Every structure is written in C-alpha cells, then in structure tokens.
C-alpha cells in the first residue's frame, strides 16, 4: 500500500500560494483556480515566498516568445486540463479582440459579429454552455437582437487591460458550474502582484475597408478611427498599498453587405406533394416549366423571399477598471475593484427585396435526394407586384458594471481563507429616439416575373417589368421596436485550504449566487400602409437616391451576373420617416412605443458547497491527484408580462397582423439540485513528459428564453397562420459526464507536443418542440365567408391579390372590411379582419422540454516549436470533434442535433528579436450546424467552412517606444450559410480587411 510522501513539488507550491489570494496581473503571471477571485502563478519560475511583500515573487518577461512560454507553463503546471493566452507585456495582448485570441487555443472556435469575434464554442459545445468569469467571478451578459441567453459577448471587452485568459476544459469541484465546454477566466491587473510603478499608454488608428463599400445613405464617419488606451499601476507603504487604473476608448466604422433568404425556405415538400407553395405536379398546368423535377421521394424547398442589405455601423467602446489593494500585514490582503465597460453601436441599413407568393412558376433543380433550385422563377403578369426597398436607423448601448471585494487571510502556515463578493450588471437598451431596431419600407409597384439564380455563391435576383417612372417609390409600412435586456449577478464565495501535510491539501468552499435576467420589448407596427395606403405622389423623387447593387458584393462569385437586378433606391431614414408621419397624420405611429408590451423576468438563486483533496504520491513516477465533489441547488422563478392577442387581420397580399390587447402577468417556478464529482490525475512519465486523466460531471443551465414563462405571438402572420413561443422554467440543466486523456512532451523550455482525447456524455438537452395551437381563439378571414365568396366568383385560392380585390370591391364597409385607396396598379388596399364565424387561426407554437441526450468525442493535437535562438517559432493545433447526432437533411420534421460542433485548426508563425516582432496567424473552422430552425420552421442552418489570415508586425524603437502594424482578414473572406443543400443559400456576407497602426509608450 502506498502513502503520500512529504515532498514539496512545484505543483504543491503553486496550490499553496493559490490561497494567498492575489490575482496575477501581467505577462509572466499565470493563475490556476477559476473559482477564486484571487489566484496565483503555477507557471512562475520562482515560487512564492512568505516574505514577499504581496505574497508573490515574479520575474518580468515580455514579448511574443515570452507570451507563448508563459502559456505553455500554465498548461504544463496546471491541475487538470488548462490552456491559456498570456499578455506579451503590460497593456499589450496578442490580439485586439479576446475571442480572436481564444480561437488560437485548440478546441476553441468563435462566432463573429460585425466583423470580429463575439462568442466561443469549445469542444463542440455552444456559447451558452461555456462559463465566463472575470477574475474568478461569474459575469452577466446582455445582448439585443438575439434570444436572451448566457453566451458572453467578448466584443464588450477591450484586450488592452487584460493580463491573461485561462481556459479550463476539465471539471473541478472548486470551479463554478455552467461551463460544460469550458470555464474561461479573464484576468486583469492587480498592483500588489507587481510592485513598483508600471505604466503604459497607447494610441492606434484603425482603417476598416468594409466601411468604404457602402451607399452614401448608409456610410458613417471617416476612413480612420482612433483608439487610445492606458494602464497605471503603483505600490506604496513598503508594498502594502497598491492602485491600478486601466482604461481604453475605441471607435470603429465598418460595414457589411448581406444577401439572404431572410425568412427561410418554405417546406420541405416531397416531390409528389401538392400543397400551397409546391411546384406543379406532372400533367398539371405549369409542369412543363420544370427542369430536372425532384423525384417523388425527394425533398425540396422553395424560397420565400430574396433580400440584399447594406449595413453601416459605428461603434464606440469604453473600458475601465480601478483596483485598490491593501495588505495591513503579511497574512491579510484586501482588494476592492470596479470594472466598467460600455459598447455603443449605431446602425444604418438600406435593402432591396422581393417576396414570393407561390403563384405560377418555372424552375430548374439539382439532383436529389435533397433537391434545391438552381433557378426559381415566379411568373407575375401584369407587372404590378411590389419591389420592396427598406431603410433602418437605430442605435443600442450596452453597459457592464462590476463592483467586487476580496479578502485573503493566511491564518497560519497551513490554513488559508478567502472571502470574495461582487455585484455585477449587464444592461442593453436603445440609444436612439428611433428605438433599438426599426424598418421603414418603401415599394415600387412595378414588379413582373421574378427569378433567383442560386447556382453561384451569390443568389442573383432578376426582375422583369420594373419601371420606377411609372410606379415611383412610396412608403408602404414600418416597424419600430424598443427592446431592453438586463442581467444582474450578486455572488458571495468563500474558499479555504488546509495543508494537512507538505504533499496534501484539502480545499473547501461555499457560495451563494443570485442571478436575475429581464428581457422586455414593444413593437410599433404600421400595418395599413403595407399595401400602399399612401400614394407615390406624396413622396418627392428628391427623397430617393439611385444606387447600383453589384458593386456592394464585388467579392462574391455571381456579382457580375448580367441578370442581376442592379438598380435600387436609398433614402435618408430620418427625413423620409418625418415625411411619412406628416402624410399619414399619425406621427406617433412612426416612433417606438414608450412602454413595454412584453416583459419577461427570470431569477435563479443558487447555493453550492465543495470539497477537494489534492495529493502528491511517490510511485515509481511522481503522481498528483485531486478528488472532489460539488453540491449545488437552484430555485428558478419566472414572471412574464405578455400581450393578449385580440385579432388576426389581413393587411397586405401575404401578411397578417396580430392585434394585441392589454398585457397580463404570469408566474411559474422550477427547482433542481446536483451532486457533481470530479477526479484529476497527472503523472510525470519523465521530467519532460506528462500523462493526464480527468473525470468530472458538469452542468450548463438553459438559456433564459427557454426558461421564461408566458406565451408570445409574433406580430406578423401569413396565409397559413402565425407563430409564437413559450418558455419552460422547469427545465433542468444539461448535465455532462466528461472524460479527458492527454499526453504532453515538453522537450525544451519553449517547445512542446501534446495529444488529447475527450468524451462528453450529455443528458437533459432542451429539445425544441412545435405544436399547432389556436391561442386566444383568433379568427382568420382565410376560409371565411368573404374568402369563399371570392373563390366562388372565380379567384384561385393561390391568387391572393384577386381575392383581396374581390372582397374590397364587393364587401367594403361590411364588418371587418376597411378599404383604403387603390395603389398605382389599381389594386385595392386596406385590411380584412376575421369575423366571429370565420375559422380560428392556427399558430405554430415553439416550446422546450428536457428530452434529448448526446455523446461527443474528439481529439486535440498541439505543437509549439521555437527554432533555437533564431527568433523563429511555430504554433499549430488541430481539433477533431465527432458525434452521432448530426442533422439528417433528408428527414422532415423536428430533429435534435448538436449545434456549433466543428473541426478547427490554427497555424501561427512568429519571428522576434530585439527590434522586430512578426506574427502571422491563420485560423480555420470547418462547416458546422448553427441552428435546427430557420425563418420558416424546422430546417437546418449550416455555416460553411471559414478561414482567416491575420498579421502583425511590430518594431521597438527603444526600450520605451514601440510601433505596430496589424492586418485582420487579409484575404477578405466571405461568410456563407446554407440550408439542406449547398445551393439553398440562406445568408452570404461580404465585409473586408481591417488595418491598424499603433504606437505604445512604456514608462
């Protein structure tokens, strides 16, 4: 039988010093415990000594190579499976965006938003199941324009004030719950960790080429935008008092242009199916216009619309942190810190779109079993449908505040205690009088036969008969939305350690967490102008500016297709909105509502405790083990104010408005608890070689939109009915049983090779279910008395314009029928409301339940090699992830498949000497499933493989001054999403490279 040996190792020194409660600040300081706000440095070459003024003794190293060496030391000396990125120097992180840095780590992939990293996926597990900590504290998140979730948006944090990023991939009892893929700890500066004066200031000019390729009505700001950052840290009173202050302000102008089938593809249909939206069956009129018809058992879908949007963005990001530390004795250190960030985004958009009404058509198809149209044409004659052109102008502001206090007490040589408390908030809200989102729609009613060619990367829209002189643009609809999201976390954590022997340690802790999330919104929708209630003569031609479409997609295959409908008109949103408000005489309807009609609130109160026992063993080879368990209980309360729907009204050819009445509150609750065991072991196979094993259980809580009670109906419906959603606060967290294995060879000071294998067995995934319901008993005119009269008079059921004209011309003034003026093509406009004896409208309601399980496995390969003293170095990694739960494109209906799972690879080359440093980084992510629902229902969305090349070149003028050039996305890559077939385009985005030139002064 073996017993622990009283042997002091580098690991045990690091574990002991972890309880000294000092967060490392800079490039050479690497922390080891994500659950504690104060952590220490297992990578440091010199161990902590009790006589250190702040409990830490460090050696300052800087530069690219030093950053890689420190990251390697973190990986080598950590308990469990840990990777990280360490700052090159005070105030200098390898990437300008933290998510972009994280993607250099094996197993980590990122989602991009407005041209930069936003959210992370780790080992095939999506952003909502990766926990982000700031100095060991759980952080709230708020994002407008997305479903309320738990995914942290790294775009809110500037990298200049960050010391290191730690990615904990294996489970430990002391780690807070929520990170199934990983727990990511963002470490900022602490003054007592680095005694003396430390200061730096930097300026940067940013030129984003994407901001140039925009229409004049969308462009914002100048070609070059400024950034400034600074960091000051100092200690006094013999190292007992310290202050650190960091701040940054950054502006950025950018753009991105998108071609999309924004409302998804209708279907899927079987080749032999005959329904609204299907292609003509053999032997029926129109069947002769179909080439390579889908076989009877093939699946196919047809596009619902085609849209081109040009988006201009301005962003101002402000970050700041103040840290005060006081150590009244060598045994006690207190820390008070305040962190603030603000991210302001202004958006302008102009778009061109065409809707399909599933009338007579012609089409050419790919082969099955999942067929897609190469060309889809809807025959429209005469040319009097709408060519839609819209605009938007809105702004949002996100603010994050965190106030925290930490006290670390070394009771004696064996016992250390720590108390950490913080209150943090994240709040997103409108920052414009026009709301957080809006659309002002215009149209020319001169659209004839309309086609889309999907054979190239860019879907190519063609329109016959367009005549902007005969049918000038006119306002035909508007939507103004005010949305608000606030997340708040109040957390108290206690940590302790008892060094029982020199080679054994017991860790323990308690925590309470109170998390609140609020999501509220209101929609002001102008329905009675969608069909053109106002007339074109109300809007002078001078308000509209002619543009050429193809120039804004010049980097996408297909932009030079001569059939592309190239002419569209833009406008000044504010001016046209003001004119439309005057023309209609109802200006209040062209502004967002002042209050919220939907207000959903969720509160989670959690309590936890843990025990963890760490031991060094002296077998034939040194072994370190850690055994622990964590218990956690959570209570969930969801209160929702939702509007009560009161009517279902036909307001234009293919759109129905859901009328909303007085909102009402409902409250639902849920509760759960978990025991989460963990075990880590590593063995020194040789002095330069390690083997690792880990088993642990982790949980990840459901997104807030899945938990929130209250049934919410979308305000726009279609002929076939509407849509809605409803949460379930009784959802259990996803639980994962995790196994990790690794072999690591550190064959010199700066180089290593590692191979890892991981498995995750997940249960309680929230499956999405859709049921057809008839909420509130809303009546629809479809199939009612007026509708049937039009059918009886000879209108085809698919010819909705014929049906509307008949109803308006024969039943105007009757109950529910309000006729407006005819449009320029002689078609009647107005609204037709459902009547008491009409059919009840069907709604497809989406909800959630614990019903799914999944398994995934993967391999990680890492190599880092420095070529002696030449200054050259190489870093490469590849991650392979696999699961049996892929999406079956040939299957109809709801499916459960793991989203976000993909292979990924990184290749980084560096060169560094006393004067120059060069870094070229290529990141690649394979195709992955992003969602199992699109705008039309249960259909997949695939993000195609994407690779990006970034470059930085730095020059040290002297020991104080350095300059740097950076290039992002140098090869000008595009992003593309598709559906069941690669030709079934959903989204194609063109942005552009970004260039930066900076100077930095270090005091």
What name fits each language-model region?
Residues 2-4, 776, 780-783, 788-791, ...:
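C-terminal beta-signal and terminal closure region of outer-membrane beta-barrel proteins
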Residues 58-93, 119, 127, 137, ...:
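N-terminal periplasmic "start-of-domain" segments of outer-membrane beta-barrel proteins
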Residues 99-141, 169:
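Extracytoplasmic beta-strand/coil segments of soluble accessory domains associated
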Residues 155-202, 256, 877:
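A beta-strand signature from Gram-negative outer-membrane beta-barrel systems
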Residues 761, 766-773, 777-933, 971, ...:
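Gram-negative outer-membrane beta-barrel transporters
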Residues 761-764, 923-933, 954-1003:
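C-terminal beta-signal and adjacent terminal beta-strands/loops
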